Amino acid sequence: MSDILAKIEAYKREEIAAAKQACPLSELEARAREASAPRGFVKALRSKHASGDYALIAEVKKASPSKGLIRADFDPPVLARAYEAGGAACLSVLTDTPSFQGHLDFMVAARAATALPVLRKDFMFDTYQVIEARAHGADCILIIMAALDDAAAADIEMAALDSGMDVLIEIHDRAELDRALKLRSPMIGINNRNLRTFETTLATSESLAPLVPKERLLVGESGIFTPADLSRLAQVDIQTFLVGESLMRQADVTAATRALLARNAASASAAE
């Protein structure tokens, strides 16, 4: 595990302990059972593919450790509706506060504003966080293989699947991919950003994507800014993209989302 992830795990463990004191697991489980049913994250992505379109997971992201504040006028419901209008298939909402200035309330508000399925984008270290995600309405959670051993990843995945949620399994090298393929979830996210150096290159996806079985659903993450980037990754059968920063920096998020996806729409028109 990188030094960055080790520091994150330390503060997440403190957060989890405090949350368990404030809301015991039994109470959280009751809230999760009463939450609105999961909307089907993977289903929404595959529906876009079936229509011949790229599938966009659009990220609601206020800040990041490497870039600082990304969007000052940060309004999750407004941004969520803008993404939906622009053609996004799903949403990703940062809920980590220390590193990303995120919050669970942002996810709740974004989901309530749209009909799109929502990923709780956070660092998962404990199954308590999975139940917490479902209790707040999440449709999907993230597993970062670089942050977990195999047993912990399997436990967190099982808790999510048992709750009716989907799981995005994130990897950024061959060893993590081999471990991820032992899990049950179809979604494999290839993070083009090295978590140790923060260097970002689409070559990471290009080298790893051909190693993933065809029945899996590949997601390209990080370093994706233009229609040309989408086209480049589509050459290695990546048809789903998680994009945040480049869209969050735009004044007109709906127009920017449409523009990002426009090449695919143009290609579809040309083929008709």
From Swiss-Prot:
An example Gene Ontology molecular-function term: indole-3-glycerol-phosphate synthase activity
Reaction equations catalysed: 1-(2-carboxyphenylamino)-1-deoxy-D-ribulose 5-phosphate + H(+) = (1S,2R)-1-C-(indol-3-yl)glycerol 3-phosphate + CO2 + H2O
SUPFAM superfamilies named in the record: Ribulose-phoshate binding barrel
Pathways involved: Amino-acid biosynthesis; L-tryptophan biosynthesis; L-tryptophan from chorismate: step 4/5
Pfam families: IGPS
InterPro entries from the UniProt entry: Aldolase_TIM (IPR013785), Indole-3-glycerol_P_synth (IPR045186), Indole-3-glycerol_P_synth_dom (IPR013798), Indole-3-GlycerolPSynthase_CS (IPR001468), RibuloseP-bd_barrel (IPR011060)
GO biological process: L-tryptophan biosynthetic process
Cross-referenced HAMAP family: IGPS_B
Protein name in UniProt: Indole-3-glycerol phosphate synthase
